[in-house]
């Protein structure tokens, strides 16, 4: 009997040593990984980068200003304190001139559509122009709010848990710039393919020069009123490029905001994940709850500023997805048209999905602390933990489309169902018409 008890005691000791050994090896591996990540070459750029959202998003805003959007002064300043909005700056007048030219272009497009057969395809230029015009106006209003918004953003960032190394600190900015760069390059490729497809297969040229023929078709709404001239044709093409970029930039900008806000919540979640399995003082949970509340307040302030852009982005993407899927039934006049069309459709679907996933990550990260609080040991429960859990369970933290819908992962299924429903309705009234006419305006 004594031998059996001794053997059981020995087995328990061996199991305990195995568990302790596994935990020790796991902690050692984690420590070695952190040391490996921290062994980054100490360049001047690494030490100057402060990991702020203002610094990360500055290049994206600089590109936007080249295309008449977000006329904020001081975006290249090292901190948010250099930001300002000035109605006397060239950026403001540049954006105002763009709004006026877009309004005039919209008037010519409405005139052209009014003299044609009205259907879901013919109103495409009007929907495109109206979407960009309203979005540009929203960006102009956002530029006035941007300095105050970045001031609040920086105040919340200062309260967040710090990064463990300079590599981790620079990672969100690199990710943000990479996503923006890829989307801008693909958007440029799409526009170049549209030009190639028209020039390659101009089956009823209006002028002997293929470049002039393309420019005439690209600004057909202008030359139904004015006689053709090269300077007006190039102005029309520049306007078309600005409109095309503005449409893509809406989605890029919303992705940047989604990545920045979700990274804030992710930093809080990483701190909670490290501490949640051990008893923590009540002061820690008070700090965590108040920090979470300050992030939520920032998200709601951002939502008040960009919810109009969110509604336009999702609405226009939904319309053009339905329209492009309807056009896919038609016969393509050439292989160049087919390559451009399906590349454009794939890019539109991918970009719309990316916007939804990046923005819905805010809601995903906001729900993560509720899962982590279930891991708090019994000895570590305090009234602040219950209060924190109650706030997490009752809050709906997400960006919205002008309060009409919350951007969560569930919205993906809702949009997919809407697209399927409208496609079934449109197909019933569809006829295989010659949608690829001589005017490449519909291709841009």
Swiss-Prot record:
Phenotype when the gene is knocked out: Flies exhibit trehalose-specific physiological and behavioral defects (reduced response by chemosensory neurons of the labellar taste hairs).
GO terms (BP aspect): detection of chemical stimulus involved in sensory perception of sweet taste; detection of chemical stimulus involved in sensory perception of taste; monoatomic ion transmembrane transport; proboscis extension reflex; response to trehalose; sensory perception of sweet taste; sensory perception of taste; signal transduction
Tissue note: Expressed in labellar chemosensory neurons.
Stored InterPro entries: Gustatory_rcpt (IPR009318)
Effect on the protein of changing residue 59 to S: In strain: KY02-C493
Domain of life: Eukaryota
UniProt GO MF annotations: ligand-gated monoatomic ion channel activity; sweet taste receptor activity; taste receptor activity
All ranges on the Cytoplasmic side of the membrane: 1-56, 200-214, 262-305, 360-410
Principal localisation: membrane
Pfam families from the UniProt entry: Trehalose_recp (PF06151)
Extracellular side: 78-178, 236-240, 327-338, 432-444
GO cellular component, one term: plasma membrane
Consequence of substituting residue 19 to V: In strain: AK17, Berkeley, Canton-S, EP(X)496, KY02-C304, KY02-C305, KY02-C312, KY02-C341, KY02-C419, KY02-C470 and w cx
Subcellular location per the Swiss-Prot or TrEMBL entry: Cell membrane
Effect of residue 333 to S: In strain: KY02-C326, KY02-C348, KY02-C359, KY02-C362, KY02-C373, KY02-C394, KY02-C417, KY02-C434, KY02-C448, KY02-C451, KY02-C477 and KY02-C513
Mode of membrane association: Multi-pass membrane protein
Parts of the chain that traverse the membrane: 57-77, 179-199, 215-235, 241-261, 306-326, 339-359, 411-431
Alphabetized UniProt keyword annotations: Cell membrane, Membrane, Receptor, Transducer, Transmembrane, Transmembrane helix
Family: Belongs to the insect chemoreceptor superfamily. Gustatory receptor (GR) family. Gr5a subfamily.
PANTHER family per record: GUSTATORY RECEPTOR, GUSTATORY RECEPTOR 5A FOR TREHALOSE-RELATED
Protein task: Gustatory receptor required for response to the sugar trehalose in taste neurons. Gr5a neurons selectively respond to sugars, in contrast to Gr66a cells which respond to bitter compounds. Flies are attracted to sugars and avoid bitter substances, suggesting that Gr5a neuron activity is sufficient to mediate acceptance behavior. Sugar signal transduction occurs through coupling with G-proteins such as Galpha49B and G-salpha60A.
Protein name as annotated: Gustatory receptor 5a for trehalose
Protein species of origin: Drosophila melanogaster (Fruit fly)
């Amino acid at each position: 009997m004594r031998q059996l008890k001794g053997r059981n005691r020995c087995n328990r000791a061996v199991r305990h040593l195995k568990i302790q050994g596994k935990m020790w090896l796991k902690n050692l591996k984690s420590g070695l990984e952190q040391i490996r990540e921290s062994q980054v070459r100490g360049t001047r750029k690494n030490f100057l980068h402060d990991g702020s959202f203002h610094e990360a998003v500055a290049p994206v805003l600089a590109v936007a200003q080249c295309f008449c959007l977000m006329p904020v002064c001081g975006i290249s300043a090292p901190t948010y304190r250099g930001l300002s909005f000035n109605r006397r700056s060239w950026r403001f007048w540049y954006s105002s001139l763009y709004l006026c030219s877009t309004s005039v272009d919209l008037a010519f497009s409405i005139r052209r559509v009014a003299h044609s057969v009205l259907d879901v395809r013919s109103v495409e230029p009007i929907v495109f122009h109206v979407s960009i015009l309203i979005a540009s106006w929203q960006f102009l209003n956002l530029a006035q709010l941007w300095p105050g918004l970045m001031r609040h953003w920086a105040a919340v960032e200062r309260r967040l848990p710090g990064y463990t190394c300079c590599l981790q600190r620079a990672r969100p900015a690199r990710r943000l710039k990479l996503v923006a760069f890829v989307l801008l390059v693909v958007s440029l490729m799409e526009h170049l393919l549209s030009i190639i497809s028209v020039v390659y297969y101009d089956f009823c040229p209006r002028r002997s020069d293929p470049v002039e023929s393309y420019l005439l078709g690209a600004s057909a709404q202008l030359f139904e009123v004015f006689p053709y001239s090269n300077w007006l044709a190039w102005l029309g093409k520049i306007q078309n490029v600005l409109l095309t970029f503005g449409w893509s930039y809406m989605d890029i900008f919303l992705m940047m905001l989604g990545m920045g806000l979700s990274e804030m919540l992710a930093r809080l979640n990483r701190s909670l994940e490290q501490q949640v399995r051990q008893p923590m003082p009540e002061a820690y949970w008070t700090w965590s709850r108040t920090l979470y509340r300050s992030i939520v307040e920032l998200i709601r302030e951002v939502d008040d500023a960009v919810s109009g852009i969110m509604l336009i982005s999702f609405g226009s993407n939904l319309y053009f997805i339905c329209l492009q899927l309807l056009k896919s039934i038609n016969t393509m006049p050439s292989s160049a048209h087919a390559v451009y069309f399906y590349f454009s459709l794939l890019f539109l679907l991918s970009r719309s999905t990316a916007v939804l996933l990046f923005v819905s990550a805010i809601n995903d990260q906001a729900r993560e602390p509720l899962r982590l609080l279930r891991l708090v040991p019994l000895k570590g429960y305090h009234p602040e933990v219950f209060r924190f859990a109650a706030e997490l369970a009752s809050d709906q933290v997400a960006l919205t489309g002008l309060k009409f819908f919350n951007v969560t992962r569930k919205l993906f299924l809702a949009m997919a169902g809407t697209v399927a429903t409208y496609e079934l309705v449109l197909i019933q009234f569809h006829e295989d018409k010659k949608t690829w006419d001589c005017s490449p305006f519909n291709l841009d």
